[in-house]
């Protein structure tokens, strides 16, 4: 806790805990000279904030966090964006991630919505489980995501962005989360993959009540095909979970 590993010049890899079977999320800090850019943030929990406080006076000491980049809208990646923004950091992410995060944090529910209950039935939920869930408080996004103030910088497919003294091409993936941003360095062999590019586990491809006819598997497969022309064996992929890895062409084929 409160420690980092240097994985490339000016690139720090840090790990934050998650209260689930997949018990961690990877976050990264890239040296922008007079400040840091942080890629993803972890959940908004007391424990995660405490770890960040250690990181800010430890490996990141001496310069502020000037920018947060969110790869996608899931709470383990975007949970503390608002906390960093209150400390002066700017926020960059895709429009879809921004809108989903704002919408979900402002839309808590004490019990499942009628649409969610109908989706449970449509999906064949066990009757006993359905009866129990009807009156249970569901997970709410705001349970582990700090409120995000208005104002962000949009990331788009095909853009070039400078982070940590490198120029990166932004390429979007889908399936795990809509408009998931990945970053491919033009200056060395680094790729920031978020949950779109993972080494030894498959990203969750979920269908939810908000879009019950979605086909995330098709979205995922199309994304893998789009990435293949840019993948090389020597790229070091820094993903959202597990370990950094090489051999991206084979991994895209496996996924």
Task: Enumerate the predicted regions with their spans.
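Active-site HxH/HxHxD metal-binding segment of metal-dependent hydrolases
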Residues: 44-48, 53-161, 189, 254
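Conserved HGGG/HGGXW glycine-rich cap/lid loop of the alpha/beta-hydrolase fold
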Residues: 15-18, 77, 172
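Metallo-beta-lactamase
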Residues: 36-46, 141-153, 160, 167-253
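Residues at the C-termini of beta-strands that transition into short coil/loop
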Residues: 15-17, 95, 241
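Short Pro/Gly-enriched beta-strand edge/turn motifs at strand-loop
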Residues: 7-14, 137-144, 164-166
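Conserved beta-strand hairpin/beta-sheet module of binuclear metal-dependent hydrolase folds
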Residues: 3-63, 183-199
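Short, charged, surface-exposed secondary-structure boundary motifs
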Residues: 24, 100-106, 201-205
């Amino acid at each position: 806790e409160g420690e980092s590993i240097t994985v490339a010049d000016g690139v720090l890899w840090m790990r934050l805990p998650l209260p689930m079977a997949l018990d961690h999320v990877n976050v990264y800090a890239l040296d922008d000279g007079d400040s840091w850019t942080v890629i993803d943030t972890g959940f908004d929990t007391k424990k995660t904030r405490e770890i960040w406080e250690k990181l800010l006076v430890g490996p990141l000491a001496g310069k502020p966090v000037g920018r947060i980049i969110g790869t996608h809208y899931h709470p383990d990646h975007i949970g503390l964006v608002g906390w960093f923004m209150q400390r002066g950091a700017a926020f960059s992410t895709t429009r879809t991630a921004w809108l989903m995060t704002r919408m979900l944090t402002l839309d808590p529910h004490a019990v499942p919505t009628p649409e969610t209950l109908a989706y449970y039935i449509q999906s064949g939920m066990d009757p006993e489980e359905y009866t129990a869930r009807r009156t249970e408080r569901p997970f709410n996004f705001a349970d582990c995501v700090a409120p995000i103030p208005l104002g962000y910088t949009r990331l788009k497919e095909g853009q070039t962005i400078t982070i940590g003294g490198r120029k990166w091409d932004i390429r979007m993936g889908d399936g795990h989360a809509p408009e998931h941003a990945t970053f491919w360095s033009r200056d060395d062999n680094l790729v920031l993959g978020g949950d779109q590019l993972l080494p030894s586990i498959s990203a969750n491809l979920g269908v939810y009540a908000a879009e019950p006819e979605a086909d995330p598997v098709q979205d995922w497969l199309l994304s893998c095909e789009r990435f293949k022309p840019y993948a090389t064996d020597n790229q070091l992929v820094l993903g959202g979970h597990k370990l950094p890895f090489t051999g991206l062409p084979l991994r895209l084929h496996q996924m």
